[in-house]
A protein has these predicted regions:
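Bacterial Sec-dependent signal peptides at the C-terminal "C-region" and cleavage site
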Residues: 3-18
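Amphipathic alpha-helical substructures
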Residues: 19, 27, 61, 235-275, ...
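Solvent-exposed, acidic/flexible segments
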Residues: 26, 30, 44, 56, ...
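Elongated, non-catalytic scaffold/linker segments and compositionally distinctive motifs
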Residues: 23-87, 91
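Juxtacatalytic substrate-recognition/specificity segment
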Residues: 96-217, 227-236, 248-260, 264-272, ...
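TPR/TPR-like alpha-solenoid helical repeat scaffolds
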Residues: 48-57, 75-95, 407-411, 415, ...
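Sec-exported extracytoplasmic/periplasmic mature domains
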Residues: 26, 56, 68, 72-75, ...
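Beta/coil-rich, acidic/histidine-enriched accessory regions frequently appended to metallopeptidases
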Residues: 16-36, 65-69, 273-276, 307-465, ...
Length: 511
């Protein structure tokens, strides 16, 4: 998601320094805006322009103060009060942040446990710049600035998104005002793929710069979702199983979402399922375009959109000789060729800032109190040393025809392990990881089984993925440190050992 800064200006003559700052910011050219700001004066229009530049740079307190100082003639201007309130909320949300810059990347975050994110945040952004930027025709000048918010509430305060929209769709990252606003994995009850999300938001920034912000949301999201893994791999990743399931169902029922419904933001769709379906649709459209015409096709589309071409027509121009119907028909044929398996899977609900326990974040048990009740009885029996009886209850929590539950799979695996049935537990966990790859607890359990069986390479893969989703488990960090040491990688072993020690210390409470 992307948005333009709205510089609050008085009706003034053209080509003033304030106009120049605005023009630079509209082009996402921070270096240009800095240079233009050198000619700003002390009039209200100049103060407002300086405030907008500072806001784009993440300097919220001076931005607020300069915009407030411009109130002599701007107080009654349309949007002034809302803009000033946003600057104030942003200043409060980041008041305890520290800033670190490496090369032309700046990351701001709260001291404490979120320090385990900063090294890999820098590495992800640098890799995205080096690997993805050239595919899209370059990257914005002036570097990139990112904030890592420790809670979803702070992200909401600083993002301008309604809290209700964030809680409905789970959108907890944003590219806006030439900055990346990203929530810590702690903001979601089970963590999330935050590094791919960083790359995703950076791609939004690139697309906005390349097109002068003329790309509609569906095209932005299609490019970002299809390219977000390319910072670490050479080809777009397959659809997540839950997304593939939703897309297969929509194709079968002829219930694909119209592109217009995705405007003005995916955050305003009606449910997590609808948002996931939208992402699946638009990302596969872009993957199809890449496969049909090569990786450079996306950059060609951006060139045309920048020139004012309608986005879908630009895609059709590059992908199907200008024939929109032919492109869409080709895309549908491509989807059929994927042989999407319509396995019944559930989409996890949105649980933010510790609002629920591990049952609440489960995609099945979080929605079915009756099944959760049976599973909780199983937990009691397992804790009492009665794994056979626990299995009976766990089976009640997984009736035929219902989607699989990742939490229930891990609980059942625990009971099987207690009964010395490790091969059965491993098979169950492997299936759960295939269906729900972003559940760290399942990957951690599978990793432990693989380690016990001497499969250190496979165990490393599971613990690496688990820590990528939820980096705040000190035990997983310690195990990953051991596995890096066994691979002869002393620097990464020490990094994750340091993270484990940090996570076992006391951290001040955050709001």
């Amino acid at each position: 998601m992307i948005g333009l800064p709205a510089v609050l200006l008085l009706p003034i003559a053209a080509a003033t320094p304030a106009d120049d700052v605005k023009a630079c910011l509209d082009r996402y050219d921070i270096a240009c805006a800095r240079q233009a700001a050198g000619s700003l004066g002390s009039d209200d229009a100049s103060l407002a322009a300086r405030a907008e530049l500072e806001f784009a740079l993440g300097e919220f307190t001076p931005a607020r103060d300069h915009l407030k100082a411009a109130s002599r003639s701007l107080a009654s201007a349309e949007g002034y009060a809302e803009r000033l309130a946003l600057f104030e909320r942003s200043a409060v949300a980041t008041a305890d942040f520290v800033s670190e810059t490496r090369a032309d990347v700046t990351v701001r975050s709260r001291p404490g446990f979120d320090a385990v994110l900063t090294d890999e945040a820098f590495e992800t952004l640098q890799a995205a710049h080096d690997r993805i930027g050239p595919l899209l025709g370059g990257a914005p000048p002036g570097g990139v600035r990112m904030e890592l918010y420790p809670t979803a509430q702070r992200f909401i305060d600083a993002s301008s998104l309604p809290g209700s929209a964030v809680r409905t769709t789970g959108v907890i990252a944003l590219s806006k005002w030439t900055r990346l606003l990203v929530s810590s994995p702690r903001a979601l009850g089970r963590g999330y793929g935050w590094k791919d999300t960083i790359a995703h938001e950076y791609i939004h920034y690139i697309v906005a710069w390349r097109t002068e912000d003329r790309a509609p949301v569906w095209l932005q999201e299609g490019i970002a979702r299809s390219h977000e893994a390319l910072w670490r791999t050479d080809q777009p990743e397959p659809l997540a199983p839950t997304h593939a399931s939703l897309l297969a169902e929509a194709l079968a029922n002829d219930s694909l979402l119209p592109l217009a419904k995705m405007h003005p933001s995916m955050a305003f769709l009606s449910s997590p399922e609808e948002a996931s379906l939208a992402y699946a649709q638009v990302s596969t459209m872009v993957v199809y375009l890449r496969q049909a015409k090569g990786p450079g096709a996306v950059s060609e589309v951006l060139d045309r959109v920048r020139e004012g071409r309608d986005a879908l027509q630009a895609v059709a121009d590059v992908g199907a000789g200008g024939d929109q119907a032919a492109f869409m028909a080709g895309w549908r044929a491509y989807l059929k060729g994927l042989k999407l398996v319509g396995r019944k899977l559930a989409e996890a609900g949105v649980v933010l800032d510790g609002a629920g326990d591990e049952y609440a974040v489960d995609p099945v048990l979080g929605e079915r109190a009756d099944l959760a009740r049976a599973a909780r009885i199983g937990d009691i029996l397992l804790d009492a040393g009665r794994p056979d009886a626990a299995l009976v209850e766990y089976r009640k929590a997984a009736p035929d025809g219902e989607p699989a539950s990742p939490l229930l799979s891990s609980r059942t695996a625990n009971a099987l392990i207690a009964l010395k049935r490790e091969p059965d537990a491993r098979k169950l966990l492997e299936g759960s990881v295939r269906d729900y790859p972003e559940f760290a607890v399942t990957r951690t359990m599978l990793g432990k089984l693989l380690l016990a069986a001497g499969s250190t390479g496979a165990a490393f893969t599971q613990f690496r993925h688990a820590v990528d989703v939820d980096p705040f488990d000190p035990a997983s960090q310690a195990t990953l440190a051991d596995l890096y040491a066994a691979r002869g990688d002393a620097p990464l072993s020490e990094r994750h050992r340091r993270y484990s020690r940090l996570l076992q210390s006391n951290e001040p409470a955050t709001r």
